[in-house]
């Protein structure tokens, strides 16, 4: 019986504790004048991932997006959002921990971020910007290669 408890204690644990909106802002610095101008706006999207340990075996993983939309040289709107999740991750091999934090966790949080960004932009009176699907595995692998290249330089 004690052996069963020890074996159960060694089982890998991956649990989502909470997903929440950590930060959100939308600015229209040139309103209302820019709203009557005609033209095709240019949309620029930047994504980021942050990982913070918050307790033993508990991590906060945040995915952020900055959406900048310009009409010519003037900003139509700027949306910044950060969606985060708290994950309990225990009894995982060290070589598997970074991919879980860099691929699996952002993949869970990102759909919430996409919905928030589209919603806030449409509530501001603009057509929603639907963030593209992201291959977090490819992003993680590119980041790993970039880091390895910097170490070799």
UniProtKB/Swiss-Prot annotation:
Q: What is its main location?
A: cytoplasm
CC per GO annotation: cytoplasm
List localization entries: Cytoplasm
Q: Which Gene3D superfamilies match?
A: SecB-like (3.10.420.10)
**What GO terms are given for molecular function?**
unfolded protein binding
User: HAMAP family annotated for this entry?
Assistant: SecB
Keyword set, alphabetical order: Chaperone, Cytoplasm, Protein transport, Translocation, Transport
Q: What does this protein do?
A: One of the proteins required for the normal export of preproteins out of the cell cytoplasm. It is a molecular chaperone that binds to a subset of precursor proteins, maintaining them in a translocation-competent state. It also specifically binds to its receptor SecA.
Disulfide linkage: none
The domain of life is Bacteria
Q: Name one GO biological process term.
A: protein folding
Q: How does it assemble?
A: Homotetramer, a dimer of dimers. One homotetramer interacts with 1 SecA dimer.
Among SUPFAM superfamilies, the record links this protein to: SecB-like
Q: Which organism is it from?
A: Leptothrix cholodnii (strain ATCC 51168 / LMG 8142 / SP-6)
Q: In its keyword annotation, does this UniProt entry include Cell inner membrane?
A: no
**UniProt keyword annotation of Cytoplasm present:** yes
Among Pfam families, the record links this protein to: SecB (PF02556)
Q: Which family does it belong to?
A: Belongs to the SecB family.
Put simply, this protein is called: Protein-export protein SecB
């Amino acid at each position: 019986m004690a052996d069963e408890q020890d074996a159960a204690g060694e089982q890998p644990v991956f649990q989502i504790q909470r997903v929440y909106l950590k930060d959100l802002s939308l600015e229209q610095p040139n309103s209302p004048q820019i709203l009557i101008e005609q033209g095709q706006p240019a949309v620029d999207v930047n994504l980021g991932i942050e990982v913070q340990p918050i307790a033993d075996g508990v991590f906060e993983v945040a995915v952020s997006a900055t959406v900048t939309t310009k009409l010519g040289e003037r900003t139509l709107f700027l949306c910044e959002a950060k969606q985060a999740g708290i994950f309990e991750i225990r009894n995982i091999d060290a070589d598997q921990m970074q991919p879980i934090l860099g691929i699996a966790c952002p993949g869970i949080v990102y759909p919430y971020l996409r919905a928030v960004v589209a919603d806030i932009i449409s509530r501001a009176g603009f057509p929603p910007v639907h963030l593209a699907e992201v291959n977090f595995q490819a992003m993680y692998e590119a980041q790993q290669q970039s880091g390895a290249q910097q170490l070799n330089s």
